[in-house]
């Protein structure tokens, strides 16, 4: 009887956790085609849409977010934890994985903790300069920690903490060297996999306000499902070329196209910008631990990006940042060189080799 070589990747919620997990899964299977990768997530996360579409089996458990201000929400999560742990233990017994990798998100904590307690090989991948609470706790129990930012190491415990960079989707990594010169100035905007209302409203207001800044400007804007209809209707009156999308599946195409991006401060967005050498204007998502702000600050300190705090985001401020970059080609060229230093090639393969060694 052939023993299945299962590896489990736990986590999700947003594209910033799911797509790096998929990149790791593909790298594992490339190194050893006999490996079967299973994903564990929750019903509320985007993994329920993305993972099956990518061809991997997905198992769902109960979990939630502890790092919230609402006492009611925190209580709901606390009640889900024992259920999620029991589901995790049962699933681990069924799959008997060679390794369990947590990539962050609701399901990562309980599943990796259960796997560590039982005695399975475990690892966590931390995308942010300031690790989240779950990974700070899990780092004490797991065999290996993989980090994107070197600054994260001082916040984690454990004997094996390795800086590997951000696992970038294979189709994006393959397209890195295909960027081309643009006649117009190309601005790509997105607020993460689910969109950002404040970025959507600010950028659309800035564009519709017209003025010198829209001359020879071309915009591609991923809006997310909640705002797509309303904002794309607004853009019909835009004084420049605008392509609104609900969701962009072929991000590599538009990274090749873009001169600058306006985005949140998730590590995935930063890594993909670094891979293509695109200057980001980052609007960090406010959160309890401000991990996106700390990610953005890492870039700003190295003159590799710009940051606008959400409380300071206005059409005027956004236009000012875009125009200051657009007007100074030498500055842009230097910032492109700087952000490329944040890119570690073949990160997913590095992680896969560490798992399989």
Curated annotation (Swiss-Prot):
A biological-process GO annotation: lipid glycosylation
Broad class of where this protein is predominantly found: membrane
A GO term from the CC aspect: plasma membrane
Top-level enzyme category: transferase
Record-listed UDP-N-acetyl-alpha-D-glucosamine binding positions: 14-16, 128, 169, 193, 248, 292
Cell inner membrane found in the keyword field: yes
Enzyme Commission number(s) from the entry: 2.4.1.227
Pathway(s): Cell wall biogenesis; peptidoglycan biosynthesis
Family: Belongs to the glycosyltransferase 28 family. MurG subfamily.
Role description: Cell wall formation. Catalyzes the transfer of a GlcNAc subunit on undecaprenyl-pyrophosphoryl-MurNAc-pentapeptide (lipid intermediate I) to form undecaprenyl-pyrophosphoryl-MurNAc-(pentapeptide)GlcNAc (lipid intermediate II).
Protein name: UDP-N-acetylglucosamine--N-acetylmuramyl-(pentapeptide) pyrophosphoryl-undecaprenol N-acetylglucosamine transferase
